[in-house]
């Protein structure tokens, strides 16, 4: 028989309908379900695909460097980072008329270009790159790494180089190598780069391979390190009037604890950053020697887990059985990795704007907005994925005998209590927050704004005060100049930090009021409800009171026929599917809040946010409508401007989003009938009937149509907001 797609599933390959194609694509990466798969081959395939992933990442970053070097304006941007607009790449579009060519010719370019809102210019400048040649060199190096990764992936699929199953299951060795090798050594190497290349560059000294060994990064070299006088490395830091990239006001320190921001660049001190990375390297290099391998020293993770029995005996057998459960389940490991990565990505979003580490990026408002929004959305998708694979673990890999009465089993035993508590918290947050917003709306509508219910976030203000913010007059801990906490840190690091916290031009500890109180609770509602849906999906994945045998149906199933009182929409997949909508809406509130708060801060009219954010009409009118006006007017009978492309994307995003509903709110039979009518017409139309297809066309399954709908909803939603965000910010601030 001829080989048909998909080769990994003979059952699907013989399917006579178009289901073969769609199910083939859907299960292409579900290696576990493929014909003739063994546990060893599964691990080897995944391992090899990691190299492919790395190759793609290196190729992509290489492309960024290459296009900026070729078509960008890096060298002229460096001369004046605050006023020259950084160019991402040129645009060649045969549809452009003269007005379009003029509108998109910016940043000193000769023709139409795209502006970079990714922050790469600021990053490359901060780490010591200065010329187009530097960028080309970086691009070539990354291209080399990409090729190396591809070769590595291919090599590890060859019989001689395939790692064995025992190698993959050796958790202690992997942890040691990842902690020491991946995090420790790379952090140490990055500290080295900052000290040897980036910090000298920030002081006007150009260090490259040709003079790398001649230029001492510190006047006394390794002397202070070897004699134990480490504090010398912190002496004579850059002064507050230091001009970044020049010798003016430059010091000689390489590892400092200044705190706060460089006055000119509004970013963290490079010497503080180097110090931070050195500390991280130190911690991880030690951490990478903790676990017992073939040397017989260090901890055995299994022993650690088995020894952890909760006190009092009332919480079961603690972590017994967890080692084998985690080590033998790829889905459990992936779930843990995704949960960690999701949290880290969200933390990156929060820290990139509040503690900016790249020179001048804090004054590039559109880039700040784009990076915050980008990282929050990425975090949302990664976190929902963590719960998806947690649910798949419970269905495919969980063994009740191995986990008797341990924490996993007890989570399942207590799932009703967990789910109902989450439900109660979500209901409480939702009704109270909405109640306050709607009450305030009504008061404004009736012309009595003074009757709004406005709650000051006193606990959050108290926390900000404890960290040194004096605005609220709490006089506590670091905001109390006479207290022991304040005096203890004074010589060490406090002056820079306290100045930064109380300087109202940055995003560190923004002043908060009733509008912030309300939107924080709206976001808390979104987070708790998303979590409720995801946790319920995972805890009910194996079975529920309604459907005790759910695990036998797999991760995703539409229904189990008409019986049992209705078993549709209760697969773990359905929970994930619903949670993604909540995740997107929650991040919508998060990004609306962040963006509006910052727009008013940057424009110097914070009172607009403070006054309008306490009722829903304020959000709709003074944030969404007011800031989309330029977009809605992007191209009109009087010509076009550089926002036109965003106006088009705004419309296009709405279109994609709305298309999602066609798949989400429909029934399979309708499509099947429509498809058969279209196929009938096709077969009876001259010329068209010369083209035949081998597979009988059938409608998508219910689950597939939901996936397609969800994809359109998500992509359209994000496209629409991206266009709104970039256009409304760049339209105001350039």
From Swiss-Prot:
Binding annotation for [4Fe-4S] cluster: 559, 568
Enzyme class: oxidoreductase
Residues noted as binding chlorophyll a B1 in the record, renumbered to the chain: 654
TM stretches of this protein: 46-69, 135-158, 175-199, 273-291, 330-353, 369-395, 417-439, 517-535, 575-596, 643-665, 707-727
Family per similarity comment: Belongs to the PsaA/PsaB family.
Tagged with keyword Electron transport: yes
Annotated source species: Oryza nivara
Gene Ontology cellular component annotations, sorted alphabetically: chloroplast thylakoid membrane; photosystem I; plastid
Cofactor binding comment, as recorded: P700 is a chlorophyll a/chlorophyll a' dimer, A0 is one or more chlorophyll a, A1 is one or both phylloquinones and FX is a shared 4Fe-4S iron-sulfur center.
Assigned keywords, A-Z: 4Fe-4S, Chlorophyll, Chloroplast, Chromophore, Electron transport, Iron, Iron-sulfur, Magnesium, Membrane, Metal-binding, Oxidoreductase, Photosynthesis, Photosystem I, Plastid, Thylakoid, Transmembrane, Transmembrane helix, Transport
EC number(s) per entry: 1.97.1.12
Keyword Ligase listed: no
GO molecular function, one term: magnesium ion binding
Catalyzed reaction equations: reduced [plastocyanin] + hnu + oxidized [2Fe-2S]-[ferredoxin] = oxidized [plastocyanin] + reduced [2Fe-2S]-[ferredoxin]
Protein name, per record: Photosystem I P700 chlorophyll a apoprotein A2
Compartment(s) where it occurs, according to its Swiss-Prot or TrEMBL record: Plastid, Chloroplast thylakoid membrane
Function summary: PsaA and PsaB bind P700, the primary electron donor of photosystem I (PSI), as well as the electron acceptors A0, A1 and FX. PSI is a plastocyanin-ferredoxin oxidoreductase, converting photonic excitation into a charge separation, which transfers an electron from the donor P700 chlorophyll pair to the spectroscopically characterized acceptors A0, A1, FX, FA and FB in turn. Oxidized P700 is reduced on the lumenal side of the thylakoid membrane by plastocyanin.
Alphabetized InterPro entries for the sequence: PSI_PsaA/B, PSI_PsaA/B_CS, PSI_PsaA/B_sf, PSI_PsaB
Principal location listed in the UniProt entry: plastid
Sequence positions that bind phylloquinone: 671
GO terms (BP aspect): photosynthesis
Sequence positions that bind chlorophyll a B3: 662, 670
Annotated membrane topology: Multi-pass membrane protein
Subunit structure: The PsaA/B heterodimer binds the P700 chlorophyll special pair and subsequent electron acceptors. PSI consists of a core antenna complex that captures photons, and an electron transfer chain that converts photonic excitation into a charge separation. The eukaryotic PSI reaction center is composed of at least 11 subunits.
């Amino acid at each position: 028989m001829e080989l048909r797609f998909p080769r990994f599933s003979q059952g699907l390959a013989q399917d006579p309908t178009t289901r073969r194609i769609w199910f083939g694509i859907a299960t292409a990466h579900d290696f576990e379900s493929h014909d003739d798969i063994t546990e060893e081959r599964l691990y080897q395939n995944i391992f090899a695909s990691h190299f492919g992933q790395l190759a793609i990442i290196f190729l992509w970053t290489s492309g960024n460097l290459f296009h900026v070097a070729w078509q960008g304006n890096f060298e002229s941007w460096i001369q004046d980072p605050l006023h020259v607009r950084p160019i991402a790449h040129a645009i060649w579009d045969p549809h452009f008329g003269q007005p379009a060519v003029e509108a998109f010719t910016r940043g000193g370019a000769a023709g139409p270009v795209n502006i970079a809102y990714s922050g790469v210019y600021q990053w490359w400048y901060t780490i010591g790159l200065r010329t187009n040649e530097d960028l080309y060199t970086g691009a070539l190096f990354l291209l080399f790494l990409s090729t190396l990764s591809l070769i590595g992936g291919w090599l590890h699929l060859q019989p001689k180089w395939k790692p064995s199953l025992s190698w993959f299951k050796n958790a202690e060795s992997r942890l040691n190598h990842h902690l020491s090798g991946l995090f420790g050594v790379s952090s140490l190497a990055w500290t080295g780069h900052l000290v040897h290349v980036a910090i000298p560059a920030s002081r006007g000294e150009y260090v490259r391979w040709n003079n790398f060994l001649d230029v001492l990064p510190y006047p006394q070299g390794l002397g202070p390190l070897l004699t134990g006088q480490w504090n010398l490395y912190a002496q004579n830091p850059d002064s507050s009037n230091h001009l970044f990239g020049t010798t003016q006001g430059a010091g000689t320190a390489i590892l400092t604890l200044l705190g706060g921001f460089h006055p000119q660049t509004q970013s963290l001190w490079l010497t503080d950053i180097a110090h931070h990375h050195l500390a991280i390297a130190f911690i991880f290099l030690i951490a990478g020697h903790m676990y017992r391998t073939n040397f017989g020293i260090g901890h055995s993770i299994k022993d650690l887990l088995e020894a952890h029995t909760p006190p009092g005996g009332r919480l079961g057998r603690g972590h017994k059985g967890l080692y084998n459960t985690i080590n033998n389940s790829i889905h459990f490991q992936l779930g843990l990795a995704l949960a960690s990565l999701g949290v880290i990505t969200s933390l990156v979003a929060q820290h990139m704007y509040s503690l900016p580490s790249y020179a001048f990026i804090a004054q590039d408002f559109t880039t700040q907005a784009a990076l915050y929004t980008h990282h929050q959305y990425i975090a949302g998708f990664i976190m929902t994925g963590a719960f998806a694979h947690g649910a798949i673990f419970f269905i495919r890999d969980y063994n009740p005998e191995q986990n008797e009465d341990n924490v996993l089993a007890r989570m399942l035993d207590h799932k009703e209590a967990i789910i109902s508590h989450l439900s109660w918290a979500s209901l409480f947050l939702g009704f109270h927050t909405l109640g306050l917003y709607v009450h305030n709306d009504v008061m404004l509508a009736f012309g009595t704004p003074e009757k709004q219910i406005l709650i000051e976030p006193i606990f959050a203000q108290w926390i900000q005060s404890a960290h040194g913010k004096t605005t609220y007059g709490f006089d506590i801990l670091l905001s109390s100049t006479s207290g022991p906490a304040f005096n203890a840190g004074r010589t060490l690091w406090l002056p820079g930090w306290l100045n930064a916290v109380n300087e109202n031009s940055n995003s560190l500890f923004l002043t908060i009021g009733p509008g912030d109180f309300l939107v924080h609770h709206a976001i808390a509602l979104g987070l708790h409800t998303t979590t409720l849906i995801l946790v319920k999906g995972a805890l009910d994945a194996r079975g529920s009171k309604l459907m005790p045998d759910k695990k036998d149906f797999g991760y995703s199933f539409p229904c189990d026929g008409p019986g049992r009182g209705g078993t549709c929409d209760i697969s773990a997949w359905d929970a994930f599917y619903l949670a993604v909508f909540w995740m997107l809406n929650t991040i919508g509130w998060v990004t609306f809040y962040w963006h509006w708060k910052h727009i008013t801060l940057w424009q110097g009219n914070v009172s607009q946010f403070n006054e309008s954010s306490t009722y829903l009409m304020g959000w709709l009118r003074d944030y969404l409508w007011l800031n989309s006006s330029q977009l809605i007017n992007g191209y009109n009978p009087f010509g076009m401007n550089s926002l036109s492309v965003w106006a088009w994307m705004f419309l296009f995003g709405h279109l994609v989003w709305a298309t999602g509903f066609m798949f989400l709110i429909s029934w399979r039979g309708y499509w099947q009938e429509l498809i058969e009518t279209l196929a009938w017409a096709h077969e009876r139309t001259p010329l068209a009937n010369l083209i035949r297809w081998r597979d009988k066309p059938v409608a998508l399954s219910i689950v597939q149509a939901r996936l397609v709908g969800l994809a359109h909803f998500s992509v359209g939603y994000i496209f629409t907001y991206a266009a709104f965000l970039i256009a409304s910010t760049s339209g105001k601030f350039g």
